[in-house]
């Protein structure tokens, strides 16, 4: 079977490019089969883009050759790392009749154990890096996202992703990268491009402008390698779980969490999850108890959540963060300070400590019991903050599916409706109370559950992560989700709250509105210089 390309003779340049790629890569790495092409055209929300075919280079040199040829044949290229960009567009290109460049074969890993850095290719997943560190550098820790363990480390960093625990905002801990421009030109940032440089892979900036920022959420080149900071595995890891019963408590609680971040007592991110979000992680919609055409009633949601008997997490918002300590004395002192300042701001608070030996054991067998953790959803957070991959929040994508959650989850092929709205806001209780009611109102009006997450990624800023979750096979739900998304995004922008990450197949930077500077024209000039005769779409 062949792709739809066969039935579009006007796309002659794509045919010529296909033949060229077969010569360079070998026929087995130029994919035209219908089932693969169909998967590349499928996301967790409605899309219309079509794909010509897929190429799978196995080295930076092959990427370079494919890009130079794409420039010659004027073929648009859409790079993907591993394709687990669920909720933001999956593998679907920005425009139709693109050639998808799958970089999963570039899966090299190189660790500097002394300086705690790792250099990876775009095909390296969180799971692969975890296993490599566990076997070869057990003293090192890499922080994980809440997404699939099989998602790409580089892809997440380039698209403004963040992790749980230390080094939360990935991009802030990128030391250097290697990129190939559409012309085939080759770039190494920092000191990496200089011969015999002793701080190659160590220094964030070389001499002159730091060019690595040009490749974050951009189409100016394809990143084939990245060096990222790691952390030392802590001697002690403390987990703090807490919850509140009234939304009004968010005001003082978030301000106090911000103070704890600013003072340095909390180095990790803090997370506050709406009760709807927790319920969706541990169950599916109660079809026999509620009207499926409406948002699940809040009182019923809280009743069902409490029936799950999750210790501490039984409130309207349920929180977690971690403290990483070098000594037991440090751990005990920090615990006492945190309990003193937080206990009056929350309805429930619990903490416990695991030591390095326990973490090492969990790395090899994450099913081992931890006496202080009696529920799997709390155990999952412990593992994530300890840098141990689990399925994270992926099961919540099946909340509105009438079929059971499968053992192997593929959100695209299982027709899970899932759409992320990723908002940046000041880390303050006032802003939380401004945002939350608006999000809840829009979701309720459209019949979706407001699965809100407030995430304190640093001492100044919090991410407000809201997901539209539905079943795509239900007629009209794709359109309803899109309408809710667009209207809510517009309303939040009028309030001063913008998205920091966009679902690429139907959103663009232009959708954020008119700028008050000349960035658009400056970026256009950069693109005109670097993208002559070629077109790379935003890195996925």
Which role fits each region the language model picked out?
Residues 5-9, 44-53, 75, 80-81, ...:
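Conserved glycine-rich FAD pyrophosphate-binding loop
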Residues 17, 69-70, 256-257, 331-345, ...:
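Short amphipathic alpha-helices in soluble, non-transmembrane regions
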Residues 20-42:
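Conserved oxyanion/phosphate-binding beta-strand-loop segments in alpha/beta enzyme cores
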Residues 41-140, 151-164:
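Long, structured ligand/cofactor-binding scaffold of large enzymes
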Residues 58-60, 247-248, 323-332, 428, ...:
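Helix N-cap motif at beta-to-alpha junctions
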Residues 108-110, 122, 127-263:
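FAD-binding subdomain of flavoenzyme oxidoreductases
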Residues 211, 227-228, 238-249, 253-393:
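C-terminal cap/substrate-recognition region of VAO/PCMH-type FAD-linked oxidoreductases
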């Amino acid at each position: 079977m062949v792709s739809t390309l066969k039935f579009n003779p006007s796309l002659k340049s794509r045919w010529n490019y296909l033949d060229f790629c077969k010569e360079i890569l070998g026929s087995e790495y130029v994919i035209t089969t219908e089932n693969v092409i169909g998967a590349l055209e499928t996301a967790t929300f409605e899309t219309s883009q079509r794909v010509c075919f897929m190429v799978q280079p196995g080295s930076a040199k092959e990427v370079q050759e494919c890009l130079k040829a794409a420039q010659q044949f004027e073929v648009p290229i859409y790079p993907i790392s591993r394709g687990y960009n669920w909720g933001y567009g999956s593998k679907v290109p920005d425009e139709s009749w693109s050639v998808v460049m799958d970089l999963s074969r570039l899966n090299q890993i190189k660790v500097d154990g002394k300086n705690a850095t790792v250099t990876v290719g775009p095909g390296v997943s969180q799971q692969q890096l975890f296993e490599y560190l566990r076997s070869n550098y057990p003293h090192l820790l890499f922080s994980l996202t809440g997404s699939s363990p099989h998602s790409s480390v580089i892809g997440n960093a380039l698209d403004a992703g963040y992790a749980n625990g230390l080094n939360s905002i990935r991009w802030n801990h990128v030391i250097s990268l290697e990129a190939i421009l559409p012309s085939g030109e080759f770039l190494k940032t920092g000191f990496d491009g200089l011969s015999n440089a002793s701080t190659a892979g160590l220094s964030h900036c070389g001499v002159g402008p730091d060019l690595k920022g040009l490749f974050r959420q951009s189409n100016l080149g394809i990143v084939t390698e990245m060096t990222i900071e790691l952390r030392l595995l802590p001697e002690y890891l403390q987990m703090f779980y807490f919850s509140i019963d009234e939304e009004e408590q968010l005001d003082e609680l978030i301000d106090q969490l911000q103070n704890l971040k600013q003072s340095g007592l909390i180095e990790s991110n803090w997370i506050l999850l709406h009760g709807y979000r927790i319920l969706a992680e541990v169950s599916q919609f109660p079809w026999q108890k509620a009207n499926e055409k409406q948002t699940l009633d809040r009182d019923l949601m809280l009743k069902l959540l409490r029936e799950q008997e999750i210790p501490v997490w039984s409130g309207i918002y349920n929180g977690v963060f971690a403290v990483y300590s070098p000594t037991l004395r440090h751990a005990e002192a920090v615990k006492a300070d945190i309990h003193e300042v937080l206990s009056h701001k929350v309805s429930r608070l619990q903490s416990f400590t695991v030591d390095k030996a326990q973490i090492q054991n969990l790395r090899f067998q994450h099913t081992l019991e931890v006496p202080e953790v009696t529920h799997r959803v709390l155990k999952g957070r412990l593992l994530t903050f300890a840098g141990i991959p689990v399925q994270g929040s992926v099961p919540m994508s099946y909340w509105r599916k009438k079929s059971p959650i499968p053992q192997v989850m593929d959100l695209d092929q299982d027709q899970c409706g899932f759409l992320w709205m990723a908002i940046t806001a000041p880390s303050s209780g006032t802003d939380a109370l401004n945002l939350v009611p608006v999000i809840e109102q829009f979701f309720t009006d459209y019949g979706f559950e407001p699965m809100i997450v407030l995430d304190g990624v640093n001492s100044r800023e919090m991410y407000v992560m809201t997901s539209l979750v539905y079943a795509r096979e239900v007629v009209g739900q794709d359109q309803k989700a899109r309408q809710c998304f667009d209207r809510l995004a517009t309303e939040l922008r009028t309030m001063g709250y913008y998205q920091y990450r966009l679902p690429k197949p139907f959103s663009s930077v232009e959708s954020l509105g008119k700028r008050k500077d000349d960035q658009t024209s400056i970026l256009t000039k950069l693109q005109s210089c670097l993208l002559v005769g070629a077109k790379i779409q935003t890195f996925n």
